[in-house]
């Protein structure tokens, strides 16, 4: 199974990988919120830190030749700040604020990927 999973990741398009990363950020944030609700601070810490690591990866892999990269870098920085605040304060509000923004950004990337694929068949 591990070999299959590795192979499927290796054959993904850049758009597929970004989509997968956003899905994992959203998943980890939701799990972190559930852990917070259950006063499982160790669990919420682990989930929030993983989400931050993925957001940091998304930020460090931006292609800065495009104008939009600066705005995305600022957004990613804000997402990580809010996740950190939720983790430090043991409060769901900062994550609840950015979760819809992250979901919307994921959808925007997904739509852009579909348009690129339609414009470049094969």
What are these regions (language model features)?
Residues 1-23, 27-122:
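C-terminal-biased regions
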């Amino acid at each position: 199974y591990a070999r299959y999973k590795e192979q499927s990741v290796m054959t993904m398009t850049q758009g597929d990988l970004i989509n997968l990363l956003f899905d994992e950020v959203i998943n980890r944030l939701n799990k972190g919120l559930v852990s917070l609700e259950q006063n499982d601070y160790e669990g919420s810490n682990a989930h929030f830190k993983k989400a931050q690591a993925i957001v940091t990866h998304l930020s460090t892999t931006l292609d800065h030749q495009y104008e939009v990269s600066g705005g995305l870098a600022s957004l990613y920085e804000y997402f990580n700040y809010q996740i950190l605040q939720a983790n430090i304060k043991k409060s769901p509000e900062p994550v609840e604020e950015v979760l819809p923004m992250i979901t919307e950004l994921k959808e925007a990337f997904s739509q852009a990927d579909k348009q690129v694929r339609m414009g470049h068949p094969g």
